[in-house]
Curated annotation (Swiss-Prot):
GO biological process, one term: rRNA transcription
Subunit structure: Interacts directly with the N-terminus of the RNA polymerase subunit beta (RpoB).
Domain of life: Bacteria
PANTHER family found in the cross-reference section: RNA POLYMERASE-BINDING TRANSCRIPTION FACTOR CARD, TRANSCRIPTION FACTOR YDEB-RELATED
Impact when changing R47E: Weakens interaction with RpoB, decreases growth rate and virulence, and increases rifampicin sensitivity. Abolishes interaction with RpoB
Signal sequence coordinates: none
Effect of a null allele: Essential for growth, it cannot be disrupted.
Name this polypeptide is given: RNA polymerase-binding transcription factor CarD
Organism: Mycobacterium tuberculosis (strain ATCC 25618 / H37Rv)
Length: 162
């Protein structure tokens, strides 16, 4: 996949990002192109070797079809999850690291429902906040709206599904 300056992409763990520049760096005598990504949430800039962009999970923002699938995931019935906190946390961490928007939606759905039913530990609350931030950023881009509106959409879908 070829990215150009000005493209909006999604970077795993951080969500939506703008390709701010493409720079050439010399490392061990070899010139390589790097994508300079400015993450939408917070003040973070990430440099990714262009040849490894897909490998690390950099991808385009979901389209309408992808958005419909995300909403299906959010509305899906509750899935059985490990009762052991550490196993559940690790499984959710792996889903977030995958960079797959549907897996991020699963984490948001499952933690949100667990929070409604039993409450969450501090670690899971932070994870839910991070997963929501990633999902809201992508929803805002996919719907061409701001984060506040995307958050409202997410809350409505979650509330309607429970």
């Amino acid at each position: 996949m070829i990215f150009k300056v000005g493209d909006t992409v999604v970077y795993p763990h951080h969500g939506a990002a703008l390709v701010e520049a493409i720079e050439t760096r010399t490392i061990k005598g070899e010139q390589k192109e790097y994508l300079v990504l400015k993450v939408a949430q917070g003040d973070l800039t990430v440099r990714v070797p262009a040849e490894n962009a897909e490998y690390v999970g950099v991808r385009d923002v979901v389209g309408q079809e992808g958005l419909d699938k995300v909403f299906q995931v959010l509305r899906a019935p509750h899935t059985e999850e490990p009762t052991n906190w550490s196993r559940r946390y690790k499984a959710n961490l792996e889903k977030l690291a995958s960079g797959d928007v549907n897996k991020v939606a699963e984490v948001v759905r499952d933690l949100w429902r667990r929070d409604q039913e039993r409450g969450l530990s501090a670690g899971e609350k932070r994870m839910l906040a991070k997963a929501r931030q990633i999902l809201v950023g992508e929803l805002a881009l996919a719907e061409s709206t701001d984060d506040a509106k995307a958050e409202t959409i997410l809350d409505e879908v979650l509330a309607a599904a429970s």
